[in-house]
Amino acid sequence: MLQPKKTRFRKQFKGRIHGAAKGGFELNFGQFGLKAVEPERVTARQIEAARRAITREMKRQGRVWIRVFPDVPVSSKPTEVRMGSGKGAPDYWAARVHPGRIMFEVDGVAENIAKEALRLGAAKLPIRTRVVQRIAD
């Protein structure tokens, strides 16, 4: 699963996801992409599950690019623990995804296979997405 090799601090504030994506909203690598429509935190496990679903549907042909990286540590306290006594330990890693952000790109397969693969990958994610296609020049 994806996570940073080294971070400056173990824990971060929760933060909010305001506004549209400031970058990463165009297809840079593949012919087809999966674009986020709403803001949400996406965990490393969800990204990996979507990647596996896309790769499996493409039968390991073509190429898949992951355009989001989980760099936000999310902490949680154990169950049935009283409030207070500090912030919980880091539990998992997440990526803050803004609306308009391209999350996955695929290339090297037929259009119908690519769209079906991205649709199956989108089912593993907690946000509404849209399949986008590069406009032929």
Curated annotation (Swiss-Prot):
SUPFAM superfamilies hit by this protein: Ribosomal protein L16p/L10e
GO biological process: one example: translation
InterPro entries on file: Ribosomal_uL16, Ribosomal_uL16_bact-type, Ribosomal_uL16_CS, Ribosomal_uL16_dom, Ribosomal_uL16_sf
Stored Gene3D superfamilies: Ribosomal protein L10e/L16
Keywords: Ribonucleoprotein, Ribosomal protein, RNA-binding, rRNA-binding, tRNA-binding
PROSITE patterns: RIBOSOMAL_L16_1, RIBOSOMAL_L16_2
Cellular component, GO, one term: cytosolic large ribosomal subunit
GO molecular function: rRNA binding; structural constituent of ribosome; tRNA binding
HAMAP family, alphabetized: Ribosomal_uL16
Protein purpose: Binds 23S rRNA and is also seen to make contacts with the A and possibly P site tRNAs.
Family membership: Belongs to the universal ribosomal protein uL16 family.
NCBIfam families given in the database record: rplP_bact
Subunit annotation: Part of the 50S ribosomal subunit.
Protein name (database record): Large ribosomal subunit protein uL16
Source organism per UniProt: Methylobacterium radiotolerans (strain ATCC 27329 / DSM 1819 / JCM 2831 / NBRC 15690 / NCIMB 10815 / 0-1)
